[in-house]
Amino acid sequence: QGIEGYYEKALHGTTGYQEVEVDNHGRVVRLLKEVPPVAGKNLYLTLDLHLQQYIESVLKGQRAAVVVVDPRDGGVLAMVSSPSYDPNPFVKGIGYQAYKSLLENPDRPLINRVTQGLYPPASTVKPYMALSALSAGVITPNTTFFGAPTWTLPGTQRRYRDWLKTGHGMLNVTKAIEESADTFFYQVAFEMGIDRIHEWLSKFGYGQSTGIDLNEEYAGVLPSREWKQRVHKKPWYQGDTISVGIGQGYWIATPIQMVKALTTLL
């Protein structure tokens, strides 16, 4: 389980042994072959114990996930999934009732929410959408857009609301990020289209495992035309693209993916 399970072979090393000849009384007569043991390798963690303990105390009694990384090298300084469970009963073999209780707990303590919790990334993706649109030439730093309270999908009567009921007024990309203006990113998503969105947002690690050295990790979903057809047997609609523009709709990600995307941006 966890980090020890991932590095079991490296930590365990190799067991040594001897092949000997014995007499009819079981006494060793001579040594035929000897293979000395090889010690396991040392493992140095990046975790900050005090930071880990502090976050655990803050999250006590809550359902939440927190992961803190060093943006310089991606090292994990703290990782907390709450509520958690006591791993000690698993060492000697946990009883049926105790294990059943953990499985049926509605707070799902056996799930590592950092690597297995799947959530819409929501407005956290707006900086990545902006950078992608800038890089693709869809917008420039000087592009302006009037952020009304709603945005209408061209050619339809379908309206999408902004979180700010009064709207944001005239926006450029910087102000749109600062104010988390939904309508600006509806327009950006519409102009980019789902194919380019999928291509660019994949560069930030969405829809794929992060490579963290833990076995329990979900890849999440960065939706595409092919994904929707394969999973839902339905075509992709423009309205689907608009929701993706603000990190909603079919898009789901883990907290560790979200923090990796941020370190990629930094």
Predicted segments, located by residue:
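Small/polar-residue-rich segments within soluble enzyme cores
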Residues: 1-40, 78, 259
